Amino acid sequence: MTQEKRETREEEVARIRSYLASQAMRRTPEQLVETLREAHQQFLTATAAVTAAAFRTIPREGEWSAADVLAHVCTISAFDERSICGVIEHGKQPKDVDDALEQAPSGATREQLLADIERYRERLIAVVLQADPQAYLDIVWGHNEFGKMNWREWLLFARVHTLDHAHQMQAIAVALSPFEEL
C-alpha cells in the first residue's frame, strides 16, 4: 500500500494559481459566470445544512462558526463586486485584499448575509456579462496568498473561494449535527 504525499500549502497555492491563470483566459465570461453560479448553489446548500441552533457555534477551538464563514463570504463577495465592477466599468485600480477571518457581527442574521451575498453576486454577474472579455486585463490587484490577478482571474477565484467555503460549511454541519440533540 502506498502512502499519498500530502500537498503543502505552497504547492496548493501554486496549483490553484496555475489553474486560475490558464482557465480564466480559456473560458468565456459566460462560462466563468456559470462556474460561479454552480459554486454559489453548492455554498447555499451547505449553508442550509447548518441548523439555526448551531449557526454561531464554533465546532472546535480555533475554527470558524458558520456565521463567521457566512460573514467572510459576504465581505469577499462585496469586495469582488466593487473591485471587478470598478475595473470593468471605469478602469479603476482596486486595492489589494487581505483574505482573513473576521467574526460575524453579533446582529447579523443568516438571512441578511445571504441576501447581501445574492445582491453582490447578481450585480457582479450583470456587469461581467456585459463586459468586453479583453478589456482592462492589464489592471491587476493582489490577494495576500494568491498574488496579483486580473478581473477574469478574480472572477474564477471567486468560484474557488466559494467552493472552499462550501466545503467548510459542510464540515461544520457534520461536526455540529449532534448539537441539536444536546
Predicted regions and their residues:
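Short, contiguous alpha-helical
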Residues: 2-15, 19-21, 56-98, 138-182
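Short, contiguous, helix-prone interaction/anchoring segments in small proteins
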Residues: 26-60
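Acidic/histidine-rich alpha-helical segments that form the ligand environment
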Residues: 35-40, 44, 100-138, 156-158
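Short low-complexity stretches enriched in small and charged residues
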Residues: 22-29, 34-36, 79-82, 120-123
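Amphipathic, non-membrane alpha-helical segments in soluble helical-bundle scaffolds
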Residues: 26-36, 63-70, 110-117, 152-155
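Structural signal for well-ordered, non-membrane alpha-helices
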Residues: 40-48, 78-81, 85, 118-132, ...
